[in-house]
């Protein structure tokens, strides 16, 4: 999800207790809109990440968020895993390991659980991540676990403290840090590394996030060249960063990816969410067409993107969860 999308989802709901937010998230009454369940999830996230200041409430928030892993929605569960990784709260690590190694969970959910463990920097999860990297039947999950292992090792090596990194405009904890500023790459050099199939995946991701932080039209077009990559994981991450950047110049590229019927659902869903985040008028008919998409995660992503577009363009003061 894009940072701007998250900020809207995190707008505080004063009238809801943690228990009420949990009930909306898990759809206790059976009639909660998916968008409102997301809103409840991100409100619980805001509490879960305050584990230093409010440890008991943060623990409850983590437990309530984890209850949603019993849901049937692949989109919701993948967002649950993402949110847990972003909290920095290690209380969720054991549950994330279980979800990652549970092959009954959908691919996108296992992938996001693996990525979340990397975001947490949880060295205690390295063994489980190695197992996932070796044994998971999905290439996307195996690649995610490879990245998570490399990120944890990078963080533990001290490089995180010594490398000169650009101050990010984005609050997300990413699967890899951007390339260090100590080497003065230009955009064509970064594009070459981004698309170098012989380079380690972690380094290619670092090039990706350096291009994201540049954020110019030239950098966006360089990133768009990655949509020809054979890896669904790689392409979905490019769509994600386009949602963060919010540059309308990428709309045609995202539309083209979303229309690819052969493309992996994880890529197409991320393209739909990115289009919703950019929210120019020309994306509306595209998203509406995909409300009837063959892939459930794409249908749900289009619905959420349209709900958020309506909210952005209405006079509503509060995006009510109930």
UniProtKB/Swiss-Prot annotation:
Transmembrane segments: none annotated. It is found in: Cytoplasm; Nucleus. Binds 2 Fe(2+) ions per subunit. Pfam families: HEAT_2. It comes from the Eukaryota. PANTHER family: DEOXYHYPUSINE HYDROXYLASE (PTHR12697:SF5), PBS LYASE HEAT-LIKE PROTEIN (PTHR12697). Belongs to the deoxyhypusine hydroxylase family. This is Deoxyhypusine hydroxylase. It comes from Eremothecium gossypii (strain ATCC 10895 / CBS 109.51 / FGSC 9923 / NRRL Y-1056) (Yeast). The gene is LIA1.
């Amino acid at each position: 999800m894009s940072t701007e999308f998250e900020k809207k989802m995190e707008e505080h709901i004063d009238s809801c207790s943690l228990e009420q937010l949990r009930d909306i998230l898990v759809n206790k009454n059976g009639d909660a809109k998916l968008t409102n369940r997301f809103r409840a999830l991100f409100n619980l996230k805001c509490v879960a990440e305050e584990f230093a200041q409010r440890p008991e409430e943060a623990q409850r928030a983590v437990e309530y968020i984890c209850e949603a892993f019993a849901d049937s929605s692949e989109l919701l569960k993948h967002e649950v895993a993402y949110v847990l990784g972003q909290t920095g709260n290690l209380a969720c690590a054991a549950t994330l390991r279980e979800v990652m190694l549970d092959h009954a969970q959908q691919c996108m959910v296992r992938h996001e659980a693996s990525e979340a463990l990397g975001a947490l920097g949880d060295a205690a999860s390295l063994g489980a991540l190695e197992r996932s990297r070796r044994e998971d039947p999905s290439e996307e999950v195996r690649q995610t676990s490879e990245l998570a292992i490399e990120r944890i090792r990078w963080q533990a090596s001290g490089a995180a403290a010594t490398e000169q990194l650009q101050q990010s405009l984005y609050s997300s904890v990413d699967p890899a840090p951007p390339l260090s500023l100590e080497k003065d790459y230009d955009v064509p050099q970064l594009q070459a590394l981004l698309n170098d199939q012989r380079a380690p995946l972690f380094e290619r991701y670092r090039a990706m996030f350096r291009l994201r932080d540049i954020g110019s039209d030239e950098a966006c077009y360089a990133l768009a060249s990655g949509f020809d990559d054979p890896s669904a994981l790689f392409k979905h991450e490019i769509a994600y960063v386009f949602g963060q950047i919010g540059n309308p110049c990428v709309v045609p590229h995202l539309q083209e990816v979303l229309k690819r019927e052969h493309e992996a659902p994880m890529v197409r869903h991320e393209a739909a969410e990115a289009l919703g985040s950019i929210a120019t008028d020309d994306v509306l008919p595209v998203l509406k067409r995909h409300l009837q998409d063959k892939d459930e995660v794409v249908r749900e992503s289009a619905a959420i993107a349209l709900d958020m577009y309506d909210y952005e363009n209405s006079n509503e003061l509060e995006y009510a969860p109930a």
